[in-house]
Amino acid sequence: MAERCQRIDEEVVASRDEISSLPDDLLIQILLLVPIKDAVGTMILSKRWRYVWTLLPKLEYSDPGDECESVWKFLEKLLELHKAPFLETLCIQLDVGKLVANAVDRFVRKLELELHWTAEPTSLPKSLYTCKTLVELTLSDKIIVDVPSSVCLPSLNILRLFYVVFKDENSLERLISSCSVLARSKVGLAISDNRDYRFAKVHKLRLEKPHIDVVCHTDDKFLKAISLVTYLVLPLEDPMALDFRGFTFTRLGKLVICPHGHLWLDIIPLILNNSPKLRFLAITSVMDIDPEISHCHGTNQGTVPRCLSAHLDEEFVWHGYRGNEEETQLIRYIFANAKCLKKREISTFHLEEREVIETVLKSMPRVSTTSTLVFK
């Protein structure tokens, strides 16, 4: 009698679980209809179900607002255990705002956030702009910088903004003004998003060590707005040739130029003329500049820039010097007019012409008889 009851129970269970007897292909199609977490959860039903989910050809995850740490652990384990011959689709949708808010709630100190260039512009939670523990903040691509009036970032000392979208013309000013210990600021503008914005108020900021890295095309509004910086890293491109007329970098002491295009040699004399207190000048060239198309007409001006005659006393550095006619004209101009210069450091890409270039440089007349020449 007991054996008969047991056999009946087994038959009932078997009839209730007929779905488990279906082939893998059908079970996979069924699991594709449910959320990925539910599909993974079927592994505890029985041995038959333990590995079915690992054969799914598509993995789609939509953030339900879970804790960010558990989300990434789940996704990592999901891919680690996945056994399908081909993964046709991997789609992960996360709520960036929730992730950032969770990070702020956990007293984040360093936050780097970059969106893919195809993503929709995304705003961040207001709590980010009142995070008291945040020391370093990097925002890149398609992030809307919408800074509330209540912004307060007392610990922030490194700020990097690359190709972000400013909500309005006051957002940048409010953000930087709220950082009482900000020592270094790297600011990049996507002109397609900011062309009509005015940055007139940015120049009123007083940073202890203003340091701006301009990492994309800029217009004259932005350059004028940062005209009180003391340290500037500046990529020079052809369209920027006219941006340096009509305003002055009154406090600029250190300038690093990264040339691109073919008109950059013409732009440098304009910058020197508008930087009266410059003490350090570096040029970092790249390999792909065509030396045959470069020009340098600005050195023919009658008046020597004040920075050359009175202030450029620390160092002149040129990495990637080629020694062509136009570059030689510029470097000869600097050597002949930098009265206070203490050190000159030159390096070249053309190792086969190193000795010739070094000989030419050493033979150039220089007004500062005490300056040393280091050739690398």
Curated annotation (Swiss-Prot):
| Origin species | Arabidopsis thaliana (Mouse-ear cress)
Source organism, top-level taxon? Eukaryota
Whether Lyase counts among this entry's keywords is: no
Pfam families in alphabetical order: F-box, FBD, LRR_At5g56370
What name does this protein carry?
Putative F-box/FBD/LRR-repeat protein At5g52460
What does the UniProt keyword field contain?
A: Leucine-rich repeat, Repeat
Note whether Secreted occurs among the keywords.
no
Provide the residue intervals of the LRR repeats: 131-154, 199-224
User: Which residues does the UniProt record annotate as the domain F-box?
Assistant: 16-75
**Which InterPro entries does this entry report, sorted A to Z?**
F-box-like_dom_sf, F-box_dom, FBD, FBL13/AtMIF1-like, LRR_FXL15/At3g58940/PEG3-like
In this chain the FBD domain maps to: 296-348
